[in-house]
């Protein structure tokens, strides 16, 4: 149940395990629809006075896994990209960042840490183990490369 207005869809059938795509206008920001990540065909639409109010609303909540923006205005696009800390962002497109291995996919904060898909996933879930091995014999590099110590100069004079 929602306190918002179901503008489209809203039906479900347990026998066929189907849920209609649903558009909910102005749900209560405290209800579960607005408090949890949505993994279903439900689209909440909120009425805001301006772009800054929309950005403030998003930023007052846990960071989203993805943010979607539809605009022709470059200034609006840049403001939302820099002002909304989401795992990923799509401008004038939906879900494509999830469907391609060419873009990293993942969240920030409560929606997940890291990024996966394609090369990004391989690197994210691989551990680069640093190993430095120092030989047990004397370090001749200290005598070969500058800056030279007095000990290196004395050895060089004896050899040459």
PLM regions and their residue ranges:
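Residue-level detector of anion-binding/catalytic polar loops
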Residues: 5-6, 64
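Short beta-strand segments
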Residues: 6-10, 69-70
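Conserved C-terminal structural/oligomerization subdomain of aldehyde/semialdehyde dehydrogenase
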Residues: 18-160
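Basic phosphate/pyrophosphate-binding loop/patch that engages nucleotide-derived ligands
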Residues: 1-3
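Short, solvent-exposed loop/turn elements at beta->coil junctions and helix N-caps
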Residues: 9-14, 94-95
